[in-house]
Swiss-Prot record:
Ranges that cross the membrane: 14-34, 68-88
InterPro entries in the record: FtsK_4TM
Cellular component aspect of the GO annotation: plasma membrane
Keyword set, alphabetical order: Cell membrane, Membrane, Transmembrane, Transmembrane helix
Principal location listed in the UniProt entry: membrane
Annotated organism of origin: Haemophilus influenzae (strain ATCC 51907 / DSM 11121 / KW20 / Rd)
Protein name: Uncharacterized protein HI_1595
Membrane-protein topology: Multi-pass membrane protein
């Protein structure tokens, strides 16, 4: 039984699952930053007279979300949810076994 379990998971698959988990956590961080975004924060493109950061995740969250909004426009609203939901989907469907570096680069 133990031999069957160890044959299924390789170190590369463990690393892939770990990185997907970190990506999902970063996506959750971006969702919180996106939901508490306000133009009154001191961020990448704006300077505010209000000294405190209103964003719930701090000045870095305000900065990164504002950077997304400036460079990507309305598409920036999709990025936090995609960064959270795609890794969760890949982990739930066990698609990690089929992932390879060349597939990720080509997609």
């Amino acid at each position: 039984m133990i031999k069957q379990i160890t044959e299924r998971f390789t170190p590369r698959q463990y690393l892939a699952e770990f990185l997907l988990g970190l990506t999902a956590l970063f996506g959750l961080y971006l969702i919180v930053a996106w939901s508490s975004y306000t133009p009154l924060d001191n961020s990448w493109a704006t300077v505010s007279a209000y000294g405190n950061t209103i964003n719930k995740v701090g000045s870095f969250g305000a900065w990164i979300i504002d950077l997304f909004f400036v460079f990507l426009g309305y598409v920036a609203h999709i990025i936090p949810f995609t960064a959270f939901l795609v890794p969760i989907y890949l982990l739930k469907t066990k698609a990690v076994k089929q992932l390879s570096c060349t597939r990720i680069i080509l997609r």
